[in-house]
Regions:
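Flexible loop and strand-edge segments within Gram-negative outer membrane beta-barrel domains
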Residues: 241-257
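N-terminal Sec signal peptide and the immediately downstream disordered periplasmic leader
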Residues: 1-65, 71-77, 189, 238
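Soluble periplasmic/extracytoplasmic beta-strand elements of cell-envelope proteins
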Residues: 35-39, 53-58, 81-83, 91-95, ...
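Non-catalytic regulatory/gating segments with a bias toward low-complexity or hydrophobic composition
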Residues: 54, 62, 73-74, 136-141, ...
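Outer-membrane beta-barrel translocator/receptor signature
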Residues: 109-110, 122, 131-134, 145-228, ...
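Extracytoplasmic
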Residues: 33-35, 49-52, 57, 65-68, ...
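Short acidic/polar hinge/loop motifs at secondary-structure boundaries
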Residues: 102-104, 110-142
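Extracytoplasmic beta-strand/coil segments of soluble accessory domains associated
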Residues: 71, 75-118
Length: 257
């Protein structure tokens, strides 16, 4: 009986030492975190240094989580609710603050939408698909000091990829799925000279409807949209540049059931 107890004790001590060595080695390994640079306060700074409640969604997260429109932000950004209203308008609320008037074409929202730092006044612009996006910044809480009017609830800034004079590059993505879904997106960067470059992006989405109007024999909840973007940049000096971009979006849908 004593021999068995001693044998058990020895095994226990050896196991303890083995686990202790594993934990000690794992703590010695250095963990490297990617630094996220945001422009939430109108200047480039690390996300950890920002004194506001900010959620930054990087390009890798956008692709991994399949974030294609504003509606998808509801699932990934805390305190943000995005919904379709009246079948065609997109309504954004942050911490419960959103539209405070009846829905119409001239109603002023309480969450400001900015594209590359430029205020987009029309709420109908929220229908656009995300096209060639580098980062999405969501700022919660009043932002009137830096982002002006219509930002009582917060602000959303969508930052697109800038043209680069470094090298020629191109990217194409094709997605298919149920209900005849076919999505094609592409982006190409053209360096024209050492100081001038352009970037062209394209996206097309086609999908059959989820439901059908039996009387009219018409599919509802379908998707049929196209997005185009042309972006130009000229490097004037090491600290200044001139940028011009234009984006076109067209959507033709039968509406919801």
């Amino acid at each position: 009986m004593k021999l068995r107890i001693l044998g058990y004790t020895n095994i226990y001590l050896l196991t303890f030492v083995f686990l202790f060595n594993i934990n000690l080695n794992s703590q010695e390994e250095e963990q490297v975190f990617e630094e996220v640079i945001v422009t939430a306060e109108k200047r480039d700074e690390s996300l950890q240094d920002v004194s506001q409640a900010v959620t930054a969604i990087t390009e890798n997260e956008i692709e991994a989580k399949n974030i294609t429109s504003f509606v998808d932000l509801t699932a990934v950004v805390p305190g943000v609710t995005v919904a379709k209203n009246e079948g065609y308008k997109t309504v954004i609320s942050i911490r419960g603050v959103g539209f405070e008037t009846n829905q119409n074409a001239i109603a002023a929202p309480s969450v400001a939408y900015h594209m590359d730092g430029i205020f987009i006044a029309s709420p109908f612009s929220l229908q656009t698909d995300f096209l060639d996006v580098e980062r999405i910044e969501v700022l919660r809480g009043p932002q009137g000091t830096l982002f002006g009017q219509n930002s009582t609830g917060g602000a959303i800034n969508v930052i697109s990829k800038k043209p680069s004079t470094d090298s020629l590059s191109s990217k194409v993505q094709v997605t298919s799925g149920d209900y005849g879904l076919l999505k094609v997106s592409s982006s190409t960067n053209f360096p024209i000279s050492d100081t001038l470059a352009t970037r062209f992006s394209f996206s097309s989405v086609r999908r059959d409807g989820f439901s059908e109007n039996i009387q009219l024999r018409q599919e509802l909840d379908d998707a049929n949209s196209i997005s185009l973007r042309s972006d130009w940049i000229m490097e004037l000096s090491d600290t200044s540049s001139l940028r011009f971009f234009a984006q076109y979006f067209d959507s033709d849908r039968n509406g919801a059931a």
